């Protein structure tokens, strides 16, 4: 889990737009962020396996 101070820091609007970065809405992780879902790959995978993300299916080919 991300430190609470880093999560709070990311929520604040930065002085310059390029300093802004995305964090997972669930756990606060900054890496492996999926913009379409607003969460990191780990949270995405857990919720997808539980069936809590509508329209997401496991690939099979």
From Swiss-Prot:
UniProt xrefs under Pfam families: Ribosomal_S14 (PF00253)
GO cellular component, one term: cytoplasm
UniProt GO molecular function: rRNA binding; structural constituent of ribosome; zinc ion binding
Chain residues that bind Zn(2+): 24, 27, 40, 43
Reported cofactor(s): Zn(2+)
UniProt keyword terms in alphabetical order: Metal-binding, Ribonucleoprotein, Ribosomal protein, RNA-binding, rRNA-binding, Zinc
GO BP annotation list: translation
Cofactor note: Binds 1 zinc ion per subunit.
Free-text function comment from the UniProt entry: Binds 16S rRNA, required for the assembly of 30S particles and may also be responsible for determining the conformation of the 16S rRNA at the A site.
Subunit composition and interactions: Part of the 30S ribosomal subunit. Contacts proteins S3 and S10.
Family (UniProt): Belongs to the universal ribosomal protein uS14 family. Zinc-binding uS14 subfamily.
Protein name per UniProt: Small ribosomal subunit protein uS14
